């Protein structure tokens, strides 16, 4: 720790050199998870960010802004080819499962529901994700209730926009620059 906050350090296993600080912020670092090829370490920074440390050059990159409650532990898991990071975070008092693509540098909310989901884990072949959820009730304010394990296939469904979205776009009013809404006064 440094001034009460956790930080990332390296030290030789034989103790022949002093510790060297890699990364420090004015908040705690928790839930570290190393990738399978040992090139990246993902972690939760404070209460609102998922970060990734590149082991080769010790650079740190912010992957996502998300909400994490201080008293809870959150699971972060790399896919077996290390191209994805799955993690759980809080959204509207309920757990949500997110996936970050290292190739696309894009974040996806995989569940996006009013139910509580969490503990994402990839199958060894990379075709499925397992998670736990209570699809019939919320966890807030009375607790999680009975959770079950679910398997989601990781395929590119819905690669085309829905017809209703295309239809709605036809009738969207164009927004003029500098104007965010109509004011008839």
Model-derived features: positions:
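A flexible loop/linker signature enriched in serine peptidases of the S9 family
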Residues: 1-9, 16, 23-29, 39-57, ...
């Amino acid at each position: 720790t440094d001034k009460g906050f956790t930080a990332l350090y390296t030290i030789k296993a034989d103790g022949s050199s002093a510790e060297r600080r890699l990364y420090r912020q004015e908040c705690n670092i928790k839930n570290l998870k190393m990738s399978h090829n040992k090139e990246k370490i993902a972690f939760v920074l404070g209460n609102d960010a998922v970060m990734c440390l590149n082991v080769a050059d010790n650079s740190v990159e912010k992957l996502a802004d998300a909400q994490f409650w201080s008293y809870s532990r959150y699971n972060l898991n790399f896919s077996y080819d290390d191209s994805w990071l799955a993690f759980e975070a809080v959204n509207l008092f309920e757990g949500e499962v997110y996936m970050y693509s290292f190739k696309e540098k894009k974040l996806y909310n995989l569940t996006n529901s009013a139910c509580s989901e969490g503990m994402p884990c990839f199958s060894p072949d990379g075709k499925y994700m397992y998670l736990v959820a209570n699809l019939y009730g919320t966890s807030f304010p009375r607790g999680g209730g009975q959770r079950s394990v679910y398997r989601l296939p990781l395929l590119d469904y819905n690669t085309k926009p829905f017809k209703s979205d295309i239809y709605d776009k036809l009738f969207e009013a164009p927004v003029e620059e500098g104007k965010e809404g109509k004011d008839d006064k």
